[in-house]
Amino acid sequence: MVEALLSGIVLGLIPITLAGLFVTAYLQYRRGDQLDL
């Protein structure tokens, strides 16, 4: 029961974490491109 709950949380968090990393990397790329860093 606990393992299923933990695996569900992990499987739910992985796409959110990946999406957050992609968004932050994209925003940093856009910001760096605009500020010409």
Swiss-Prot record:
One of its GO terms (biological process) is cytochrome complex assembly. The keyword Thylakoid applies. Keywords: Chloroplast, Electron transport, Membrane, Photosynthesis, Plastid, Thylakoid, Transmembrane, Transmembrane helix, Transport. The keyword Nucleotide-binding does not apply. It is a single-pass membrane protein. The chain crosses the membrane at residues 5-25. One of its GO terms (molecular function) is electron transporter, transferring electrons within cytochrome b6/f complex of photosystem II activity. InterPro entries: Cyt_6/f_cplx_su5 (IPR003683), Cyt_6/f_cplx_su5_sf (IPR036099). Its main location: plastid. GO terms for cellular component: chloroplast thylakoid membrane; cytochrome b6f complex. Pfam families: PetG. It is found in: Plastid, Chloroplast thylakoid membrane. HAMAP family: Cytb6_f_PetG. The 4 large subunits of the cytochrome b6-f complex are cytochrome b6, subunit IV (17 kDa polypeptide, PetD), cytochrome f and the Rieske protein, while the 4 small subunits are PetG, PetL, PetM and PetN. The complex functions as a dimer. Component of the cytochrome b6-f complex, which mediates electron transfer between photosystem II (PSII) and photosystem I (PSI), cyclic electron flow around PSI, and state transitions. PetG is required for either the stability or assembly of the cytochrome b6-f complex. Belongs to the PetG family. This is Cytochrome b6-f complex subunit 5.
